[in-house]
C-alpha cells in the first residue's frame, strides 16, 4: 500500500460489507489512500440487490473512499446487446428496424448524444481540412462538405 497510488478491491459479488471492511483496514494504516472497486458485469446484480441498493451503490462506495469505480467490459456488453437487438429488428422489420435505432439516436441528441452525426463525430472535418491543405484548397473528394450528413442531420 505505501507504494501504490490506488488499491483495487475485488469481490465475488457486490458486497458493501466486504468493501467497507477492506476500506477501513487500508485506511487504518494508510489514511486517505485511494481505492478502486470493480463493479463487475460478471455479477448478477439483481440477484444480490434491489433497485434502491443498486441506485446508491456508487455513492456508498465513494463514501468509503472508492474513488475509482468501473464496470469492466461495460462497452462489450452494451455493444453486443444493441447489435443483437439491431440485427433482430433488421431481420424482422427491414430498414424500419434500423430507423427505430436512428430515431432513438435523434431523441437522445437533446441529452448530449452526438454519434448520430457520425462523420463529424469521428473527425471527418479535421481530415477534410488536412486534405484541403495538402491539395492547396483544390480537393474535390472531401467527405463532410455537401455530404448527406450535412444535408440531412444539421
Spans of model-derived segments:
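Low-complexity, intrinsically disordered regions enriched in charged/polar residues
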Residues: 77-80, 124
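Alpha/beta enzyme core
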Residues: 1-34, 41-43, 51-70, 84, ...
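Flexible C-terminal active-site loop/helix
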Residues: 94-145
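C-terminal helical cap(s) of enzyme catalytic domains, especially alpha/beta-barrels
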Residues: 80-96
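Short, basic, helix/turn surface patches
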Residues: 34-42, 63-68, 93-109
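Short acidic/histidine-rich active-site segments
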Residues: 71-76
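N-terminal beta-loop-helix "entrance" segment that forms/cooperates
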Residues: 47
Amino acid at each position: 500500500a505505501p507504494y501504490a497510488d490506488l488499491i483495487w478491491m475485488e469481490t465475488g459479488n457486490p458486497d458493501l460489507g466486504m468493501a467497507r471492511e477492506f476500506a477501513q483496514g487500508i485506511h487504518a494504516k494508510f489514511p486517505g489512500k485511494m481505492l478502486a472497486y470493480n463493479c463487475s458485469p460478471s455479477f448478477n446484480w439483481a440477484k444480490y440487490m434491489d433497485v434502491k441498493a443498486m441506485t446508491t451503490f456508487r455513492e456508498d462506495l465513494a463514501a468509503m473512499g472508492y474513488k475509482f469505480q468501473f464496470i469492466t467490459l461495460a462497452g462489450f456488453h452494451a455493444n453486443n446487446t444493441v447489435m443483437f437487438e439491431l440485427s433482430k429488428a433488421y431481420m424482422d422489420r427491414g430498414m424500419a428496424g434500423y430507423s427505430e435505432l436512428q430515431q432513438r439516436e435523434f431523441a437522445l441528441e437533446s441529452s448530449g448524444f452526438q454519434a448520430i452525426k457520425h462523420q463529424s463525430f469521428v473527425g471527418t472535418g479535421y481530415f477534410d481540412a488536412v486534405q484541403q491543405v495538402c491539395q492547396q484548397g483544390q480537393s474535390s473528394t472531401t467527405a463532410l462538405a455537401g455530404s448527406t450528413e450535412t444535408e440531412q442531420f444539421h
